[in-house]
Amino acid sequence: MQMADIARIAGVSKSTVSRALADSPLVNDKTKSLIRDIAQQHGYRINIAARNFRLKESLTVALLIPEADGVDWTISDAFFLEMTAAIAEALDQRGHALLLTRTSPQSGEWIEEFVRRRQADGIILIGQGSQHEVIQNIAKTFRGISVWGEAIAGAPYPTVGTDNFLGGQRATEHLLKRGCKRIAFVGYEPAPEIQARFQGYLSAIHAADIQHDETIVFSAVVGSSSANLVLERIIDQREMIDGFFVATDQQAVALMTALQKIGVDIPSQCAIVGYDDLPIARWYHPALTTIHQSRTLGAQILVDNLLAAIEGRDTASVKLDPELVVRESA
């Protein structure tokens, strides 16, 4: 239901509908009552964000981190902090404010409930977590959403993110070029972005005519209760592995620390490639070879997409090119 539809049903102009819903004295009470009744019957809601945008008022944008089943992601995670800083800068450059929170969705209306309670004009989500279907259902009626994550076929919301498949492929190909034959994968596979990186890893393995071994695929997330158990499994199988593609830099650094504690030399005994290119990748010893994600460019596109959606313009998903950054670990 659009404002033009209400105008057609009421037999008035679109501008009259706009004035009536804004309680303008230029519209008589009888017409206001008619228009409000029609709007209520059809579930029409005034898009406050769009109105503010047209009036050039500052918008409040909420940055949410959807939870993933069984995973304790927090806003203190290094990647989220980096993305938050980039998004805050992009919003500030455009004169808008950032509201930061973590959410634990309980129903299919969690985004709308958040907007209603917190008075945010739009939502930026960092990753889909395990909430893709929830986000998809809400995006069918609520336009003010912009998502950093993996593009999913048929999804009604635009995403911005690195080409995760290509990034996983490039990381694995680099390990293969170094002569690695038994390359393990470490990452939380159910997350859409990580699953795409895993598929890129598999593609490179198969292209090299190497048989995929499921016993050296380790599903883990830094901060989860099972992370230490996964590290123990990796250490137990370390001698049969000569390379690791790790789906995040935080996981890669945790793995390198564990391996160095038991005397493994990196990269001569075991090469490691991460993903994200966080500052710690440069500072750690040995410095981490990784896949760079352009968080600054990504944040700018996320904000531009959100403002376009609020204004009612069409937006499209964007995939950024992943860059292999070669350092000391591989």
What are these regions (language model features)?
Residues 69-82, 100-108, 160-170, 186-230, ...:
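Hinge/beta->alpha junction and helix N-cap segments in small-molecule ligand-binding domains
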Residues 182, 212-216, 265-271:
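Short acidic capping loops at alpha-helix termini that bridge into adjacent secondary structure
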Residues 60-64, 68-173, 234-240:
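Alpha-helical recognition/docking segments in bacterial nutrient-uptake
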Residues 13, 59, 121, 180-182, ...:
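Short acidic/polar active-site loop segments enriched in Thr and Asp
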Residues 1-59:
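N-terminal helix-turn-helix DNA-binding module of bacterial transcription factors
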Residues 121-126, 184-187, 217, 238-248, ...:
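Periplasmic-binding protein-like
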Residues 228-330:
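Flexible loop/turn connectors
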